[in-house]
């Protein structure tokens, strides 16, 4: 057990090293710092209370798996060096380099991004809960590229089968915006060639999936629930395809600042089609193109997008509510209704119980949903 210090808990470089089964607590800088190396295994470590980064690494061909990283960059814990010197300081896990795999980690209560990566990497089967608690304009999972269009360093990256629940953002110390900006999955400036597939994103103050000045992204089979806007595409540079996603809006955004929207788009030659949209509370102003809000029909007419997509605008029945259920383990889980009456998004009723495979989710509507247990 490595406990407290003014710098790093563990600092390492080299090749074919293993960092496993350590408990690292309350270091002012980084919990684990890998300055360079390849074929390194970082697994099953518990890192808590680091102020700059939980895990901070510059590696290639390495694996980060089964780690629990929590309470990174929490305001009340900050020391004389604050959050660190970089704009991206405060992230739970930061990995830079090619061909790393970041999987099966639990990243809880991060001051800035939950998981941030640079260059070509695979991020899969992670649970990110509560990010951007100290800093704003970040994401549960975040990437960008230092190499400009069209040579994105992120090309070939995959973000799949992750669950992101709770990205709050904060207005403390920043008054330009009226609402906090916590993004679920955030592909930022010049990120390109990233596949975002089969993720679940919920409870974000800003957008579930945010594409900002990026390009050639493939966004498929994701579930987005309870965000300001399910998808935001801002200045896409072209080649992006968005399909087969479930975007589910509640009555108001999580901060109760506006009507929740399904898709917002500002510029960019993209393809959006074959998605499932749900908005039980309002049919107007749930899509946005540049500065104008539209209904689903108006959106399709103005953009030519979503020709084969569906949008459920039916009102909930008396006493009905909606809820998201997910499985963050690597085993199948059975959920029991215990008297609840529940229906899936496709209208199929649930009887008795339902199963969820690892890192999958389901949205149910009905009565008595709080009775459901596993």
Give, region by region, the residue ranges found by the protein language model.
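Right-handed parallel beta-helix
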Residues: 1-4, 16-29, 38-53, 60-83, ...
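Extracellular beta-strand/beta-solenoid scaffold signature
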Residues: 4-10, 26-34, 49-56, 78-94, ...
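Short, solvent-exposed coil/turn segments
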Residues: 40, 86-88, 100, 136, ...
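Extracellular, surface-exposed repeat architectures
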Residues: 93, 101, 108-109, 136, ...
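Acidic, glycine- and Ser/Thr-rich low-complexity intrinsically disordered tracts
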Residues: 236-373
């Amino acid at each position: 057990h490595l406990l407290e210090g003014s710098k790093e808990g563990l600092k390492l470089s080299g090749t074919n090293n293993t960092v496993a089964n350590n408990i690292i607590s309350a270091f002012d800088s980084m919990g684990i710092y890998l300055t360079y190396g390849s074929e390194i295994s970082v697994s099953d470590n518990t890192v808590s209370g680091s102020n700059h980064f939980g895990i901070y690494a510059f590696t290639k061909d390495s694996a980060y798996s089964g780690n629990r990283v929590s309470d990174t960059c929490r305001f009340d814990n900050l020391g004389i060096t604050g959050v660190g010197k970089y704009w991206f300081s405060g992230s739970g896990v930061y990995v830079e380099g090619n061909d790393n795999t970041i999987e099966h980690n639990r990243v809880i209560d991060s001051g800035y991004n939950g998981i941030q990566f640079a260059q070509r990497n695979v991020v899969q089967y992670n649970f990110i809960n509560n990010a951007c608690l100290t800093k704003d304009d970040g994401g549960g999972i975040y990437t960008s590229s230092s190499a400009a269009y069209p040579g994105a360093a992120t090309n070939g990256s995959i973000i799949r089968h992750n669950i992101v629940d709770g990205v709050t953002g904060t207005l403390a110390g920043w008054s330009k915006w009226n609402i906090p900006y916590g993004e679920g999955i955030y592909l930022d400036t010049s990120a390109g060639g990233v596949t975002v597939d089969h993720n679940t994103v919920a409870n974000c103050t800003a957008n579930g999936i945010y594409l900002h000045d990026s390009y050639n992204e493939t966004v498929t089979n994701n579930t987005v629930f309870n965000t300001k806007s399910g998808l935001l595409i801002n200045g896409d540079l072209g080649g992006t395809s968005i399909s087969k996603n479930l975007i589910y809006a509640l009555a108001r955004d999580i901060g109760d600042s506006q009507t929740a929207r399904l898709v917002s788009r500002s510029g960019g030659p993209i393809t959006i089609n074959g998605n499932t949209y749900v908005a039980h509370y309002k049919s107007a102003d749930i899509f946005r193109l540049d500065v104008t809000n539209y209904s689903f029909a108006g959106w399709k007419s103005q953009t030519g997008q979503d020709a084969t997509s569906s949008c459920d605008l039916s009102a909930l029945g008396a006493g009905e509510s909606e809820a998201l259920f997910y499985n963050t383990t690597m085993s199948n889980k059975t959920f029991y209704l215990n008297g609840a009456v529940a229906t899936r998004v496709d209208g199929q009723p649930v009887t008795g119980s339902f199963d969820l495979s690892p890192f999958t989710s389901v949205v149910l509507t009905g009565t008595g949903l709080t009775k459901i247990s596993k």
